[in-house]
Amino acid sequence: MKVEYITDPFPYTLIDDFYDQKELDGIWQELDFYCYPEKLSPSDKTMPAMDQHGNIMKKNHGLSLDAVYRDQRILSNILSINRKILRSDTIKSHPSWFYQNLFIDLDYTLLSYYENGDYYKPHQDAGTLTILTWLYKGEEKKFSGGDFHFTDYNIDIEVKNNRMVIFPSMIWHAVDKIKMKEEDLDQGLGRWCLTQFLSSNLTR
């Protein structure tokens, strides 16, 4: 695992290879179950950000895992394995006061999947802290695009397998449009993202 704490122009954390192979196997066991169109919901059903006119800012498919499993989170490999970041000291080890003084007692996990033509326009998240983990099948991507951007700061982050980025939810961010070949569609070969939205009862 490689952790990089960035402080300028705002504090965020970039982590490569956060999950070990056993954890990845468990995550993929669940993702393989979801990689059928009928199991994922369209953009308007997955807590989308909207512009001032009420237009949805993204095109992708996804699933709110907390809504599915509710009080049975232990039945989800993903919801069990992604506790790892919350149990570790990784978040609060960032030197910024923002991370060292966080109080978090709520978290929600959204599973998102991007295929050909999918994107997420610049937006902010509700909550205090956002954690993104990107995943795709195989050693090489079967898609182009899908990179991540902090749009107000012209910061571009390449999407890599098992890469995590942690940042304040109010920071504007976006995802490039995905491009895929026809023969690679509908097989779960696109861009997967596990998003953890962290906040507290005091901010909701």
Where are these regions (language model features)?
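Short hydrophobic/aromatic beta-strand or adjacent loop that forms the aromatic wall/cage
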Residues: 10-12, 128, 191-193
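Catalytic core of Fe(II)/2-oxoglutarate
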Residues: 137-204
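Short histidine-centered beta-strand/loop micro-motifs
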Residues: 120-125, 157-158
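A short glycine-rich, His/Asp/Glu-containing loop-to-beta-strand
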Residues: 100-113
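Tight coil/turn sites that cap or link beta-strands
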Residues: 107, 117-118, 162
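Non-heme Fe(II)/2-oxoglutarate
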Residues: 1-96
